[in-house]
């Protein structure tokens, strides 16, 4: 598969399985059934090998879900070994999402031995009432234990996912989370605002009056306090929802925000290559049956107006602002000529 010379192709690997669905989650996920999971990993390996044989060579790998760390040790090893053997040349970053309740010392050691250099933990909050409301399966202490393991085993780069704006959250909850971040000392933080997506438990409860979201003004105040506290700890904000203290930005996600090329493998995974956008059909059983050649759906070539809109929307998420040279290269247009009067 041909990739633009100036592109920074990323590989996203989707592992859709979860023991239970979090109350805010609207991602493509499936129940964790051992036989199905093993068959899925086998199909995933076939798809990965197909792209490797075709010449695809990513600069970054990101394994997300779902819950990648919920894989058995055998399936975890098979998947990571396939990726390690397929994509060694030119790889700059390899991240795996890990949930605190399902990652352990053995899986971490296997990942490090095969080339993984970045682990991202879905903590969301260190307040037990918040964890229960969000449907998380771990407690706050487990996140501390996992990051102690990361330090013990020498994980090169670590990241922590947190959520701000959950019902009932107040400034003391933010301070609890900030104190935990200071103690854990991760290299990177992703701080997301809670959203009530249609089809989720939280959305349903809000519509039925079963819970009361916090007011927008309160959410903004909490977010500002959170960001200020992180910056006082030495974190530098480089994107709307992301900060780092050491180790730099997430290269894989930075590629998304720069509208770079990426290939998605697995059920429901999205791709953007050579100006074409598509995703694999989000159906685990059909993905398994396809044997490494999944059906592509939602295939489209963005029109110029969509390209312009995407570039502006994505790059304005970055604190550095827009790259006007990139804008002209991608669109053939001069940004100042088309937008100057509006600035």
Task: Give the location of each predicted region.
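Local cysteine-cluster metal-coordination motifs and their immediate loop/turn environment
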Residues: 14-29
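Short amphipathic alpha-helical interaction segments
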Residues: 333-343
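C-terminal scaffold of the Radical SAM
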Residues: 3-10, 29-51, 57-333
């Amino acid at each position: 598969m041909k990739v633009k010379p100036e592109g920074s192709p990323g590989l996203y690997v989707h592992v859709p399985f979860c023991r239970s669905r979090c109350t805010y989650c609207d991602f493509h996920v499936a129940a964790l059934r051992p036989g199905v999971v093993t068959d899925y990993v086998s199909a995933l390996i076939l798809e990965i090998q197909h792209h490797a044989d075709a010449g695809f060579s990513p600069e970054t790998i990101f394994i997300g879900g779902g819950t990648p760390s919920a894989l058995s040790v055998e399936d975890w090893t098979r998947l990571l070994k396939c990726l390690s053997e397929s994509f060694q040349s030119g790889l700059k970053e390899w991240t795996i999402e890990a949930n605190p309740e399902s990652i352990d010392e053995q899986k971490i050691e296997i990942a490090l031995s095969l080339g993984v250099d970045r682990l991202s933990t879905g903590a969301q909050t260190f307040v037990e009432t918040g964890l229960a409301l969000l449907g998380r399966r771990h407690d706050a202490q487990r996140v501390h234990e996992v990051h102690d393991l990361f330090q013990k085993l020498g994980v090169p780069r670590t990241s922590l996912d947190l959520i701000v704006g959950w019902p009932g959250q107040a400034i003391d909850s933010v301070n609890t989370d900030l104190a935990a971040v200071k103690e854990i000392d991760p290299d990177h933080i992703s701080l997301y605002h809670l959203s009530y997506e249609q089809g989720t438990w939280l959305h349903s409860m809000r519509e039925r009056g079963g819970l009361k979201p916090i007011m927008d003004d309160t959410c903004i105040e909490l977010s500002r306090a959170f960001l200020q506290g992180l910056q006082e700890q030495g974190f530098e904000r480089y994107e709307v929802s992301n900060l780092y203290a050491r180790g730099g930005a997430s290269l894989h996600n930075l590629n998304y925000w720069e509208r770079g090329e990426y290939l998605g493998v697995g059920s429901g995974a999205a791709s953007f290559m050579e100006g074409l956008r598509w995703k694999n059909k989000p159906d685990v059983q059909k993905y398994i049956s396809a044997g490494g050649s999944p059906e592509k759906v939602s295939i489209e070539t963005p029109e110029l107006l969509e390209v312009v809109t995407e570039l502006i929307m994505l790059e304005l998420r970055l604190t550095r602002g827009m790259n006007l040279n990139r804008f002209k290269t991608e669109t053939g247009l001069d940004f100042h000529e088309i937008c100057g009067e509006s600035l």
